[in-house]
């Protein structure tokens, strides 16, 4: 994680989403998890992102949000003050009424390069 905090903001039921995360073996890699079912509203509402910011103890302006859904992830995180990164996965739709991202990637393997660019690390 390049010495940075890592959080997951996800829509859905608490138990279902936690089971998914356990199956993906995220234990030890993630600092905080926010599940919309616990917050009472789903992304793209800004509340789940605000809760994550509070849990991490960082202002949204210092947070990068990586997601594959143009509305829930890109637009939701942008409205909450995060810097969004869109992962252009197969099956995603185009941005129609949503402003394009400054950062767009084809795979999550490109994220460290974006982090270095944002933080001006060679």
Where are the model-predicted features located?
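Asp-based, Mg2+/Mn2+-dependent phosphohydrolase catalytic module
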Residues: 9-122
């Amino acid at each position: 994680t390049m010495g940075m905090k890592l959080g997951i903001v996800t829509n859905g039921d608490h138990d279902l989403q936690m089971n998914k995360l356990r199956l993906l073996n995220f234990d030890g890699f993630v600092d905080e998890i926010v599940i919309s079912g616990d917050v009472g509203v789903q992304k793209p509402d800004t509340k789940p992102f605000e809760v994550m910011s509070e849990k991490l103890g960082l202002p949204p302006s210092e947070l990068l949000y990586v997601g594959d859904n143009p509305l829930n992830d890109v637009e939701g995180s942008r409205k909450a003050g995060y810097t969004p990164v869109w992962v252009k996965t197969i099956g995603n739709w185009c941005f129609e009424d949503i402003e394009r991202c400054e950062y767009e990637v084809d795979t999550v393997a490109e994220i460290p390069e974006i982090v270095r660019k944002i933080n001006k690390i060679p």
